A protein has these predicted regions:
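Extended, charge-rich helix/loop segments that form flexible
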Residues: 17-38, 118-135
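Substrate-binding rim/cap in mid-to-C-terminal beta-strand-loop elements of soluble/periplasmic
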Residues: 68-69, 109-190
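Extracytoplasmic/secreted proteins, especially bacterial periplasmic and envelope-associated proteins
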Residues: 6, 10, 14, 48, ...
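Generic, well-ordered alpha-helical scaffold segments in large soluble proteins
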Residues: 14, 18, 56-59, 63-74, ...
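A surface-exposed, glycine/aromatic-enriched loop/edge motif typical of exported proteins
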Residues: 3, 7-14, 101-124
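Active-site His/acidic residue clusters
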Residues: 1-10, 28-52, 88-103, 176-177
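Metal-dependent active-site segment of extracytoplasmic phospho-/sulfohydrolases and closely related
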Residues: 26-28, 59-96, 127-131
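Aromatic-residue-lined binding/catalytic grooves and analogous aromatic/hydrophobic interfacial grooves
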Residues: 58-61, 68-71, 85, 99-102, ...
Length: 190
C-alpha cells in the first residue's frame, strides 16, 4: 500500500481533476494524531483495515446498483429519486478516544453484539493484528484512515470543522442531469 499520506495527495488531485474540489483548496495537513505512513509500525495491519473498509464500500456500491436494477426491471426508475448521504464526516472511532492505547482493552459498548446470529462470539475492538471484516468481528478503520476519507478537509466526525460536518449528498432521479454538480448547501439535522 502507498499508505495514507500518498493516498490523501492522490485523492486530493483526483477531486480537483473531477471538479469536485476547487483547485484553490489546498490539502489540509495530516491530523496531528496520525503519524507519517513511513513511521507507522503496523503497516500491514493498517492496510488490512483499509482493505476491509474498501470491500464494505464496494458492497454498498453493488447494493445500490442492485436497487437501481430492480427499479429498472419494474419500470419505476423514471419515477424514483434516490438519495445517498451521510450524517457527518468520516468517523475516527476505532477504539473511542484511543481506548486500547490508554486502557489496554477494546471497546466496551452496548451497541456491539456479543455473538453473531449463529451464536459465535464477536471479537470487538481494533487490536493490532486482529482481523476485522468477518461476521464475528466488530472493528473500524480508525482516525488514521478517517483522515484520508475526509480529504481535503481537516478533522472528522465529532468536530465542527469541514471534515466533521461536510458529507456527500448524491441524488439521482427525474429532471436531475447526470454527472451534474450543485454547490447549493443542504442541511439535515439528525
Amino acid at each position: 500500500s502507498a499508505g495514507w499520506d500518498a493516498l490523501r495527495a492522490q485523492r486530493h488531485a483526483n477531486l480537483v481533476d473531477l471538479g469536485l474540489v476547487d483547485k484553490g483548496i489546498k490539502l489540509s495537513p495530516r491530523d496531528e494524531q496520525v503519524p507519517a505512513w513511513e513511521k507507522e509500525p503496523n503497516q500491514a495491519w493498517q492496510q488490512h483495515r483499509m482493505e476491509v473498509y474498501t470491500a464494505m464500500m464496494s458492497h454498498v456500491d453493488q447494493s445500490i446498483t442492485n436497487v437501481i436494477d430492480v427499479l429498472k426491471e419494474k419500470k419505476q426508475l423514471d419515477n424514483t429519486y434516490i438519495f445517498f448521504l451521510s450524517d457527518n464526516g468520516a468517523s475516527p472511532e476505532g477504539h473511542l478516544n484511543n481506548t486500547v492505547e490508554r486502557l489496554g482493552s477494546p471497546w466496551n459498548s452496548a451497541v456491539i453484539p456479543k455473538n453473531t446470529p449463529q451464536g459465535k462470539k464477536v471479537t470487538a475492538g481494533d487490536w493490532v493484528n486482529t482481523s476485522i471484516g468477518a461476521p464475528d468481528s466488530y472493528g473500524s478503520y480508525g482516525i488514521k484512515w478517517a483522515n484520508l476519507s475526509n480529504t481535503p478537509f481537516r478533522n472528522h466526525k465529532t468536530w465542527m470543522h469541514e471534515g466533521g460536518i461536510a458529507a456527500p449528498f448524491i441524488v439521482m432521479g427525474p429532471k436531475i442531469a447526470e454527472n451534474s454538480l450543485s454547490h447549493q448547501p443542504v442541511h439535515i439535522i439528525d
